[in-house]
């Protein structure tokens, strides 16, 4: 029986993790990337233990340790004075409790590392094939068991399964006729990378490098997130606030530190000192998410990641959930031949859709939870944070444990951090 062939539309972190997961199961994969070059934009990303566990199981521990920055704690602060509301241990605690780390990266570094692992000639299974400048514009399903992805250049890629991992505005999703579930959140995000040497030189910001932490500032209607990447080379900052009509209607734009600081008036001086060091290339864009919908497949076409469950960034789980999709889908496909793909896809959706929906819902709840106006409700929230291991109704213990994998894989997905 011929091995399964898979085509993945989309070469982002979710698509690459799916490709690598499938390769490890002995499945031949071709990745079609719409851009002329494979890569990721410059920004920070967090992988909580549920994602780190998957990547390490795919043989990536050494590559990840070479590019990671490890935060010791997650700190929550009050907007107007920087008072610490609560502190959650990360670092060694995560590795001991979840047998997997909580690490920060530059997105481009993480993307490059997974890409290299996909191509490694010494890796298990057939090396992944990559095609760039290959935007999928048509899906030919005249043969229902052999979908054909047709690119803008007219090339045709036939396989047993087409996976749409092409992001929040998925073309594959549209081509197979699934409903439009995109929802405007009412919020926008500023994303900045601030050079670490600027942080170190100023006594007002030097505290940011004294101890690596993942920090969230809570304020009425808006919040800040920041953490170091590349071991202090950059401070990654994400600032979220109510979206303006200009940003919603005009699309993403670049702004300077003046607008960034002006969006957080009267905040603690330390927050302003940090934001003032941004360059004139701060990306500002509206935030969207997908309304939960269990329809992730149609025939021999399946969706993965943001294409089926795009979520707001209030759990820092978007990429991590795509990686969980990848691990589960590869596990299910490894159990079958071509004739069993439909059943494998049904099990994939059964195991992942509810879990992803819960993370989506928790992220949406945190939109309100983070932004409670000062008063009794805010005081109650702060007291809860001081004693709880998570946020909303989703605990970190549940979230960071991840989607359960089959018992047969327990050993494979276990990697001791005891040296």
Tell where the protein language model's regions lie, with residue ranges.
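Conserved FAD-binding catalytic core of PHBH/FMO-like flavoproteins
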Residues: 75-77, 81-85, 103, 112-279
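C-terminal helical "tail/cap" subdomain of flavin- and related membrane-associated enzymes
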Residues: 2-4, 81, 273, 294, ...
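Acidic/histidine metal-binding catalytic segments
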Residues: 66-69, 129, 265-284, 340-346, ...
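Catalytic P-loop NTPase motifs of RecA-like helicase/translocase cores
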Residues: 38-39, 171-172, 310-312
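Conserved H-loop
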Residues: 28, 61-62, 124
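Conserved mid-domain beta->alpha element of the FAD-binding
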Residues: 9-35, 163-164, 190, 226, ...
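Active-site-adjacent segment of FAD-dependent monooxygenases/related oxidoreductases
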Residues: 43-117
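Residues at the starts of beta-strands that form the adenosine-phosphate
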Residues: 5, 28, 234
